[in-house]
């Protein structure tokens, strides 16, 4: 609990009452009513301009913040406690902040810091110059077609996802007889590129006739390709759910309107016509360049032979699921990206969920987003009901043995809709999520299942089997133009005119 000698480290704190069960402290509504009654006209105007209920509550709670200053007057050593509703968990917390005087750096330390910054800047500029030089020289040397196809990603370690299905289809249609297929991958956008790939990537980008990407890929937006080159985006997610790219302009983390990000794509392949305007907006490209052939990695979902095979494999790998009702809990992460990604597991009453599993002969598989840093800790007494499959195989394989999906804002709902089985949406922070991230269509009328905003409501839906499953088939028909397992085939034929 110590943090550099301070009893309470800076963070947000819940108040929890421990008895036979844990109860999280709640905010008394009377406090809010009293705070609102004390506002003057100017404050009421500011209050009314706020767009979310939590934002309005936090505006009122801010007046109850307590500030403690060293010696009672210090401007530099300050300890602040602010009550608020935390947006990422939708719970009442106390936000603790400590402000300390900045240590003055000596001349030597200041000079060393300046030199380090200049060195880092020079290194970046030299690497950028070398990258563009290799690319431009290679591009000039390959004015004519080079008969080369490149698969590249800055967030994928190998040929998987949509890439794998497109690659296999290229081989099936014998495109590899006419083209040399190359790959350059990096597991994570923050990882350093292999030394050899620092030269291979700009060389192959300048040479390749067809370049496949499946996510944000910063380096390809810094160069100008030949008019004859095709830059093909096979986006890793199915459908248009949460806003991305230029759809987020003006929001936190969104690009400026004059950004070059994504605009390089000459083709983007999507699942249905309904996705076209959303992806065109997100990537800043023309609608005619967005083609609804279907998403390659969904082909396997329509393969009956594979379904039989993978069900047996999954039961062998996870014997706990044999003869059980399988519930997959697969939410998206909270936080502002890879560095701060987490999931608030305290929003799950594991004891109550275990009792449900015992009563209904069920097991829960937890599949957390790859970004989530805090690991799920399953207690010994709950291991007969719960299992963490976050590190297990492709999530699509798990869908084949899943009887019920519990999610929130994950695009996994598109793939699971193929199975025409029930879903529950545990969206405890919906209002704030809409404000910060937003969706292409109204969430409440869009998702194919029951929406619950508390764990009590989630358990009620499970107990009564209130899933609103009638929403699934219309959702599937709207977002999957093709339901035949031939999306990869259509994509390759469209691109190579075969």
Regions found by a protein language model. Give the residues of each.
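Catalytic binding pocket for nucleotide-activated donors in carbohydrate/polymer assembly enzymes
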Residues: 379-382, 411-479
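A donor-sugar binding/catalytic signature common to diverse glycosyltransferases
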Residues: 211-240, 393-437
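C-terminal amphipathic helix plus adjacent low-complexity
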Residues: 135, 306, 362, 455-498
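A nucleotide-sugar donor-handling region in carbohydrate enzymes
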Residues: 125-135, 238-248, 255-338, 342, ...
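N-terminal pre-catalytic "stem/leader" segment of glycosyltransferase-like enzymes
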Residues: 8, 18, 25-30, 37, ...
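Extended catalytic core of nucleotide-activated donor transferases of GT-like folds
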Residues: 164-167, 188-257
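Donor nucleotide-activated moiety binding/catalytic core segment of transferases
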Residues: 195-210, 216-218, 370-414
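Conserved catalytic-core segment of nucleotide-activated headgroup transferases in glycan assembly
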Residues: 158-169, 290, 296-378, 452
């Amino acid at each position: 609990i110590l943090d550099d000698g301070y009893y309470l480290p800076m963070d947000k704190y819940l108040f929890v009452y421990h008895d036979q069960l844990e109860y999280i402290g709640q905010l008394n509504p009377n406090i809010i009513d009293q705070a609102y009654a004390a506002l003057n006209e100017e404050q009421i105007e500011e209050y009314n301009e706020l767009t979310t209920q939590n934002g309005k509550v936090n505006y009122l709670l801010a007046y109850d913040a307590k500030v403690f200053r060293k010696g009672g007057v210090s401007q530099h050593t300050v300890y602040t406690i602010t009550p608020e509703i935390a947006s990422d968990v939708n719970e009442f917390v106390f936000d603790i902040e400590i402000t300390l005087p900045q240590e003055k750096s000596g001349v030597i330390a200041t000079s060393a810091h300046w030199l380090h910054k200049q060195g880092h800047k020079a290194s970046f500029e030299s690497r950028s110059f070398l990258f563009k030089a290799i690319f431009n020289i290679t591009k000039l040397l390959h004015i004519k077609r080079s008969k080369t196809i490149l698969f590249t990603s800055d967030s994928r370690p190998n040929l998987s996802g949509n890439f794998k299905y497109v690659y296999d289809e290229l081989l099936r249609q014998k495109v590899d007889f006419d083209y040399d297929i190359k790959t350059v991958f990096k597991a994570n956008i923050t990882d350093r590129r292999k030394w050899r790939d620092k030269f291979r990537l700009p060389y192959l980008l300048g040479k390749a006739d067809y370049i496949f990407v499946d996510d944000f890929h910063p380096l390809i937006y810094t160069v100008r390709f030949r008019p004859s080159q095709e830059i093909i985006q096979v986006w890793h997610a199915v459908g248009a759910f949460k806003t991305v790219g230029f759809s987020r302009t003006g929001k936190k983390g969104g690009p400026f309107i004059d950004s070059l990000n994504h605009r390089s794509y000459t083709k983007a392949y999507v699942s249905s016509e309904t996705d076209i305007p959303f992806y065109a907006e997100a990537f800043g490209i023309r609608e005619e360049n967005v083609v609804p052939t279907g998403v390659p990695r969904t082909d396997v979902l329509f393969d009956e032979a594979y379904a039989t095979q993978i069900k047996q494999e999954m039961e062998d790998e996870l014997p706990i699921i044999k003869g059980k009702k399988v519930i997959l809990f697969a939410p998206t992460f909270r936080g502002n990206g890879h560095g701060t990604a987490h999931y608030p597991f305290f929003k799950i009453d594991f004891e109550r969920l275990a009792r449900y599993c015992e009563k209904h002969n069920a097991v829960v598989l937890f599949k957390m987003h790859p970004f989530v840093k805090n690991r799920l800790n399953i207690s010994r007494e709950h291991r007969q009901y719960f299992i963490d499959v976050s590190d297990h195989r492709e999530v699509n394989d798990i869908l084949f043995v899943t009887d019920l999906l519990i999610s929130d804002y994950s695009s996994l709902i598109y793939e699971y809709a193929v199975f025409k089985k029930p879903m529950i949406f545990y969206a405890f922070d919906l209002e704030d999520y809409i404000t910060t991230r937003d969706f292409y269509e109204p969430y409440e009328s869009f998702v194919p299942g029951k929406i619950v905003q508390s764990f009590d409501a989630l358990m009620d839906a499970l107990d009564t089997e209130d899933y609103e499953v009638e929403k699934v088939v219309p959702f599937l028909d709207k977002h999957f133009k093709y339901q035949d397992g031939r999306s990869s085939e259509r994509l390759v034929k469209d691109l190579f005119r075969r």
